[in-house]
């Protein structure tokens, strides 16, 4: 956790390269080894995860969320006829994995609950209109909703530039509707 909330969460790559994650978090190794042939991604799942962790503030819940947000992708990877990779259902599986791993590592229930909810909803489509923002606020609560906006921003920034401006503008509109 100290590494995750440090100024250098990217050092997770060193833990992977030296074989440490293979022992303490083997699920991370599978992420590092899973490529994403998709216009929205430049990096393997693991490198995308590292970049996403670097995009959020040094907060335990946010960094853990980014660590786990795509952990289900290796198990959900499919490739279509055009050679494009898809990961349908990965958010739900990632949330389940996050809960199991955080429990295994003896995290407190509050952290487990927040991280699991954020991971499960990180790809949730929220239309920037009052009706849909209210619905998301009711479903998630204000604290999780605001954290989710940070998670979504970090996720976009760690992807390719494909539609990045459009995605970021939508997040700005979501925040404006909320405020």
Regions found by a protein language model. Give the residues of each.
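A ubiquitous short alpha-helical element
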Residues: 82-86, 138, 179
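Charged substrate- and nucleic-acid-binding regions of tRNA-handling and nucleotidyl-transfer enzymes
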Residues: 99-104, 158-179
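Feature representing long, continuous alpha-helical segments
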Residues: 66-69, 92, 96, 100, ...
């Amino acid at each position: 956790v100290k590494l995750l909330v440090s100024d250098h969460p990217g050092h997770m790559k060193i833990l992977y390269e030296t074989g440490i994650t293979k022992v303490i978090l083997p699920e991370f190794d599978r992420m590092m080894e899973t490529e994403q042939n998709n216009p929205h991604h430049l990096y393997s799942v693991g490198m995308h995860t590292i970049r996403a962790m670097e995009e959020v503030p040094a907060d335990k819940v946010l960094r853990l969320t980014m660590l786990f947000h795509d952990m289900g992708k290796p198990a959900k990877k499919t490739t279509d006829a055009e050679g494009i990779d898809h990961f349908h259902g990965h958010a739900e599986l990632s949330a389940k994995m996050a809960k199991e791993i955080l429990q295994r590592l003896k995290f407190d229930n509050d952290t487990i609950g927040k991280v699991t909810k954020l991971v499960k909803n990180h790809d949730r489509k929220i239309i920037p209109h009052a009706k849909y923002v209210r619905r998301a606020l009711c479903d998630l609560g204000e604290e999780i909703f605001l954290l989710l906006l940070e998670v979504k921003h970090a996720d976009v920034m760690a992807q390719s530039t494909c539609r990045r401006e459009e995605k970021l503008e939508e997040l700005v509109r979501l925040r404006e509707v909320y405020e």
